[in-house]
Amino acid sequence: MARFSIVFAAAGVLLLVAMAPVSEASTTTIITTIIEENPYGRGRTESGCYQQMEEAEMLNHCGMYLMKNLGERSQVSPRMREEDHKQLCCMQLKNLDEKCMCPAIMMMLNEPMWIRMRDQVMSMAHNLPIECNLMSQPCQM
């Protein structure tokens, strides 16, 4: 009987030694960092600019100001003067991060309604931040 006890004890020790690596389960945590490249310098990325642009009502007054400059009066609020739209446009642009002004204007011009007028309006649009005294250089579009 003592012999069986020694055999069982030895088997138990071997079993514990064999299971030791299994019971020492290690946990590996992988941390992934995504660095989003921002082509517009510091501040928010283009998607952040789009969010700001949405908050600025898609620069609707800038669009109306540009349309009035083109003589597109039928599509624009007849009650507001061109100068009123310009002032409101400047307020909308001022609410954007400086790095988002030009990308937001470009996003506005990528809207379907601007496709047929894009060439005509491009030169006026890239000067909007200058007209509003918000930047010293025109937007590079």
From Swiss-Prot:
Pfam families assigned to the protein according to its UniProt record, in alphabetical order: Tryp_alpha_amyl
Alphabetical list of SUPFAM superfamilies matching this protein: Bifunctional inhibitor/lipid-transfer protein/seed storage 2S albumin
Disulfide bonds, paired cysteine numbers: 49-100, 62-89, 90-132, 102-139
Keyword Signal (UniProt): yes
Gene3D superfamilies to which the protein is assigned, alphabetical: Plant lipid-transfer and hydrophobic proteins
InterPro entries the UniProt entry points to: Bifun_inhib/LTP/seed_sf, Bifunc_inhib/LTP/seed_store, Napin/2SS/CON
Protein task: This is a 2S seed storage protein.
Quaternary context: Heterodimer; disulfide-linked.
Name of protein: Albumin-8
Organism, as annotated: Helianthus annuus
